[in-house]
UniProtKB/Swiss-Prot annotation:
Belongs to the nucleobase:cation symporter-2 (NCS2) (TC 2.A.40) family. Azg-like subfamily. Residues 56-65, 104-115, 169-186, 229-260, 319-320, 356-366 are periplasmic. The chain crosses the membrane at residues 32-55, 66-84, 87-103, 116-135, 148-168, 187-204, 209-228, 261-289, 303-318, 321-336, 341-355, 367-386. This is Guanine/hypoxanthine permease GhxQ. It comes from Escherichia coli (strain K12). Residues 1-31, 85-86, 136-147, 205-208, 290-302, 337-340, 387-391, 428-455 are cytoplasmic.
Amino acid sequence: MSGDILQTPDAPKPQGALDNYFKITARGSTVRQEVLAGLTTFLAMVYSVIVVPGMLGKAGFPPAAVFVATCLVAGFGSLLMGLWANLPMAIGCAISLTAFTAFSLVLGQQISVPVALGAVFLMGVIFTAISVTGVRTWILRNLPMGIAHGTGIGIGLFLLLIAANGVGMVIKNPIEGLPVALGAFTSFPVMMSLLGLAVIFGLEKCRVPGGILLVIIAISIIGLIFDPAVKYHGLVAMPSLTGEDGKSLIFSLDIMGALQPTVLPSVLALVMTAVFDATGTIRAVAGQANLLDKDNQIINGGKALTSDSVSSIFSGLVGAAPAAVYIESAAGTAAGGKTGLTATVVGALFLLILFLSPLSFLIPGYATAPALMYVGLLMLSNVSKLDFNDFIDAMAGLVCAVFIVLTCNIVTGIMLGFVTLVVGRVFAREWQKLNIGTVIITAALVAFYAGGWAI
């Protein structure tokens, strides 16, 4: 992957050690802007410390211990990404992989919690090997531009759907017919979300610094005043490393159990999903933050990929679900984040919230929904980057985008994009535009789905 941007003779001089380390001025940012971006990203993804323990708790994990583990993973991963890779991308327990761990591994296959953690650890080790040896970098380099932009468009649509569904604006259709329907349009969460989105439009148009963060804070305060569901539960609480039975999840993994033939296919499914899901997310966020070099490669991309994968190893050790770069990082880049200081702020806040867990309940979903919707809309601008002079490439990108949101699965969209690209090139007699890397990735993805290993 590309290295960091180089200082030119005409580039602004760093303003102190912090600026020099993170290259803040060189990337056209300020310390204040980076801190605000970090706060914005943190508020957009802090829901994970509630959602992840809730899902794993249903599978028999002690929720209090998982809360601590989730904060530790987000803190460790984001600090690694910020201090080492110097990129504004935050890491946390992936919601999709959390669901797979809880409902497929533990509840579905009746695998014990220690074995499930062993599977997460093995997934992280394999994932790191793929990243360090350059396989994942090779995948990124062989990602056609249409599919790369299509992934960004699809993730934007996905964010819109997640945010709209989270506040009840879009719901599962209760009657037979189309799969979704309009929810309770006049409900408090929906009205607050739409109002917040409109206010963000106005603040961003007027270039108000930290506009997204201001909206999140303002709606949280309104919710505390008018919404009975938003309650003050105190300020400080000591973190618990053990469950009610007194047992800790830290270092409780069973690696040998995860090597059993019945568990290994699930480990491989986790690896394949993580490789393409997180790779697409990293590419999309980097593109949105304009952190691509002249060859359209991610600046410090190799370090970003390794930070992502090493965090999953850490997850298995402390008793959490697999980690990944959060697409909510785009909320921070939309707020101006361009350096690792943004991710460092996120990591520090997740470690701080270990002791401030009651505050996490003061930020309702409808407070962060406007930020996610706004970021999703911004990511739709990738449509303008599609080269319709290369018709097959552009159409494959649109297939990728549409099916990410229709299937609610980033990897599925990428797979269908690759398939339509390769088949389209062949029937258009443009096989000379295909490279061996694209064909190999397509074959691997098709085999992954045909074998029934897809999540």
